């Protein structure tokens, strides 16, 4: 069965559309936090970074709320390159890293890219479980 939200490299789309809005970012935070919390028994850590799109500053609090509702300790790092977040996720032994970005898409888009504790992009299988 096809994935509902995740594309080839995370979730992307027009800000304030069907799945790129505060409500959905809360739900993605809650779902991903719940999944990763079951995968690691010690302190539950999620690290969030973003690119410099203005919409990231509006969407980030909803994502943090979802993650903390799932019992995660959240560190917000501010603007970072995507590969910097991947490295931090692994070196800080976090459960997960979430990058708020739409990569090369236009400025009016935004999205999420999730990394596992190894600092690598999530597998299709894990993305499907989070959905």
Predicted regions and their residues:
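Gly/Ser-rich phosphate-binding catalytic loop and adjacent alpha/beta segment
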Residues: 2-131
């Amino acid at each position: 069965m096809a994935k509902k939200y995740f594309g080839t490299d995370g979730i992307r789309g027009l800000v304030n559309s069907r799945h790129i809005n505060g409500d959905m970012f809360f739900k993605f935070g809650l779902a991903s936090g719940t999944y990763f919390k079951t995968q690691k028994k010690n302190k539950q850590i999620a690290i969030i970074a973003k690119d410099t799109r203005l919409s990231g500053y509006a969407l980030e609090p909803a994502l943090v709320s979802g993650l903390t509702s799932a019992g995660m300790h959240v560190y917000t790092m501010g603007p970072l390159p995507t590969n910097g977040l991947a490295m931090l996720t692994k070196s800080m032994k976090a459960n997960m890293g979430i990058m708020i970005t739409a990569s090369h898409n236009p400025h009016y888009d935004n999205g999420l890219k999730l990394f596992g504790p190894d600092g690598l992009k999530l597998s299709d299988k894990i993305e499907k479980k989070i959905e």
